Amino acid sequence: MIEIRNLSQRFEGPRGWIEALHNVNLTIPQGEVFGIIGRSGAGKSTLVRTINLLTRPSEGNVFVDGRDLTQLSAGELRGARRDIGMIFQHFNLLSSRTVFGNVALPLELAGVKRAEIEATVLPLLDLVGLAAQKDRYPAQISGGQKQRVGIARALASKPKVLLSDEATSALDPETTRAILDLLRRINRELGLTIVLITHQMEVIKDVCDRVAVLDAGRVVEEGNVIDVFMRPHHEVTRALIGDVIAQELPPAMKARVAERLKTGSGHLLRLAFTGSGVDQPILSETIRRYELDFNILHGQIDEIQGRAFGSLAVLATGEPGKVGQAFAYLREQGVVVEELSYVE
């Protein structure tokens, strides 16, 4: 549905050229909720704005539904953009228009007849839960409701793609969850492809199918969300996941473990489980089979894409030969085993 090929973006700054994006390649299938995450300045917003050519790339191509947007004329591009809705962190509603009027605005500008506008807008307001607020003005509704208006307005032209640029970052956690639930429902009911930009891994965990991690304008990691959480490879990904699922021990415990590791006593492990593995007595079975001691230092259970996900930090001790066999057994059971070290 969306394909980004060899895309780079440069801007001229006071100290010379700045490369905001470097050779980005992504493929986003139709009907997927795809997350793009990174720290501030990673290039996320620049990337999402190239998908509808609000920002034209310096190099590369952007294909949406098989059409290369970079090769379209101005008129053709305007037509193609009708298939791409967009919502932003700031709601950009007209204070002089009602909720209905704000959602209807793009249709009015496109010359759509009044009867057709009503037939389009009223179901959208019902979809986003604002049918009862249709005659209210922006000053009379909450921030979460304003974002729902923005979503309905973005859907008014019946797009195939919805771009979300930090759409929940200005909202409180409860409202954020409600908006994410709404986006997921829209994805399911309308078959809409959603590209979601965020700096919050919690958002990725709750709503996305796949994720790309952006750092300094480069895609440093990409994959299914559950796989990225279980097997993060890049240090930026690890740091972002650590914002949601603790990856580090408390400092005092870390110091004690480091001293113990220096003596060669034990192995510090991060174990990650998913699905049925969370409910199975895998650790106790490993202890019985291989006569190991597991000291659990830290643990957490969460849910990703509706599947249970568990993460443990353990200190394992036992006979060297049996330790290796135990690690192999754990991996056979679908457990991700990562040996850590805090020794400087």
Swiss-Prot record:
It is found in: Cell inner membrane. Residues 2-241 form the ABC transporter domain. Gene3D superfamilies: 3.30.70.260, P-loop containing nucleotide triphosphate hydrolases. It catalyses: L-methionine(out) + ATP + H2O = L-methionine(in) + ADP + phosphate + H(+); D-methionine(out) + ATP + H2O = D-methionine(in) + ADP + phosphate + H(+). The keyword Acetylation does not apply. The keyword Cell inner membrane applies. One of its GO terms (cellular component) is plasma membrane. PROSITE patterns: ABC_TRANSPORTER_1, ABC_TRANSPORTER_2, METN. It is a peripheral membrane protein. SMART domains: AAA, NIL. Its EC number is 7.4.2.11. It holds the Pfam family ABC_tran. One of its GO terms (molecular function) is ATP hydrolysis activity. Its main location: membrane. Keywords: Amino-acid transport, ATP-binding, Cell inner membrane, Cell membrane, Membrane, Nucleotide-binding, Translocase, Transport. Part of the ABC transporter complex MetNIQ involved in methionine import. Responsible for energy coupling to the transport system. The complex is composed of two ATP-binding proteins (MetN), two transmembrane proteins (MetI) and a solute-binding protein (MetQ). Belongs to the ABC transporter superfamily. Methionine importer (TC 3.A.1.24) family. This is Methionine import ATP-binding protein MetN. It comes from Burkholderia thailandensis (strain ATCC 700388 / DSM 13276 / CCUG 48851 / CIP 106301 / E264). The gene is metN.
